[in-house]
Amino acid sequence: MVLYGRNISLEKGMTMGSGFAQLDRITADIQANDLEWVEVAEGSYFKALTVHVPTNTVAYAFRMDPGAPDFPSHFHICRAMSFTTKGWFGYREGTNRVDNGMFSYEAPGSFHTPFSDCPEGFEARGIFESDSEVLLQNHVEPNPNSEILGLFTVQDFLDIASPETHVVHANGRVTGDPHFKYDFSEGFESS
């Protein structure tokens, strides 16, 4: 088979690398619209869609109310990839505006203060990926040398998870009751 210009061989019983097959046997579909928003800072909310503890990966929905205060200034310990689905937001440290339909990549080590002055508020869907449980290091002021307010971690997303949140735990156990679950792993062996 040719895929993206490369010849690949797919055979029944083939092995999967990275040990992922040992941890991920279930594919899940979550209807984000049915999950409750959880306020994490004044006027700012998250929904935990999927939490994958072995890889410190979180899929989320994020919302800021119209007129909400700035989200806390923070360092990214993680990579964040986000797609704006409603309104717009910006960073106090810059001049650009991230509009509805735009994709954002926020690199580890980046420091910024997100805000939204959109009359309808702002929403996004995204993924945090980290090399540790820590995702964000929140600061008291929009200054990277200011006092650390706290950490935002994978555990925080486990704490706000809805019953529908798909969770893969460190031991490979899968919990949550997403809208649909599938096991498409038959015929694939882990390496």
Task: Give the positions of each predicted feature.
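Jelly-roll (double-stranded beta-helix
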Residues: 1-83, 88-191
